[in-house]
């Protein structure tokens, strides 16, 4: 990719149907192993692992959080995520690591390098936000529908298709759960797909007009499209996904990541 991609997906420790605090588990492990680079507070609680990333917990303390080192290659980010998940397992080998959120806030946020995003006009930023959300709908279509429905019922912005943050360096796409880190294949395909569509939107904004027919024009419209995908309205949702697939196949980086994109388009391979 011509830019770096990263993430901070979350997970939970579960043992005998009981959920354990990631902070308590990791703090004990850190004390036992005398881990260095430990951060007790701030946004990134946990510890760093050289050249891989960091492992810790989110502000709620119950959920674990992995922060792989950013890279231009989705395959490298996937490898780092795998190594961090292994490290998380070593913290409590008897527990299962769950990426299914259900009633828990388990986000799978993806970070896209966007150093010039905030320099653009508010109108342009909004168009780009809606374009990314529209093209990312195939990823939502692959998520556990029960998960998505529960997230939707929780209200607020949690799981909202337009949920995003920018900090002058990255654009954080926040609607997804962490299910996409469940297997290396889904993980790499998800990161690559996000890279393909972000490259078209961010590096070639002039192309947005070419596929404007599948881009929501208002916030209400994109949320309506999200509902169609989540509720699987037969021919309507299939038709929408087919149109997105047709346009993405024309994108600059599609051929480079063809296998990954087609993996995302094939729901049967994921569910």
Model-derived segments and spans:
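C-terminal accessory/tail domains of diverse enzymes
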Residues: 1-102, 115-271
């Amino acid at each position: 990719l011509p830019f770096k991609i990263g993430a901070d997906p979350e997970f939970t420790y579960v043992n005998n149907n009981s959920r354990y605090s990631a902070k308590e588990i990791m703090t004990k492990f850190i004390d036992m192993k005398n881990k260095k680079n430990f951060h007790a507070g701030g946004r990134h609680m946990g510890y760093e692992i050289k050249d891989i990333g960091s492992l810790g917990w989110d502000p709620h303390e119950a959920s674990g959080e992995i922060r792989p080192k950013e890279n231009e290659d989705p395959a490298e980010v996937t490898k780092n995520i795998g190594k961090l998940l292994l490290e998380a397992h070593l913290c409590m080998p008897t527990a299962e690591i769950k990426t299914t959120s259900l009633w828990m806030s388990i986000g799978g946020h993806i970070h896209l390098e966007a150093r010039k995003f905030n320099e653009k006009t508010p109108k342009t930023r909004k168009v780009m936000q809606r374009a990314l959300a529209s093209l990312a709908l195939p990823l939502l279509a692959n998520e556990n529908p029960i998960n998505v429905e529960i997230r939707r019922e929780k209200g607020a912005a949690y799981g909202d298709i337009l949920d995003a943050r920018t900090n002058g360096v990255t654009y954080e796409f926040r609607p997804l759960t962490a299910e996409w880190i469940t297997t290396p294949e889904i993980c790499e395909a998800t990161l690559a797909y996000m890279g393909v569509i972000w490259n078209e939107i961010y590096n070639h904004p002039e192309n947005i007009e070419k596929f404007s027919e599948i881009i929501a024009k208002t916030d209400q419209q994109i949320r309506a499209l999200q509902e169609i995908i989540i509720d699987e309205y037969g021919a309507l949702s299939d038709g929408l996904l087919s149109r997105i697939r047709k346009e993405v196949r024309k994108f600059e980086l599609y051929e480079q990541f063809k296998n990954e994109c087609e993996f995302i388009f094939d729901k049967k391979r994921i569910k």
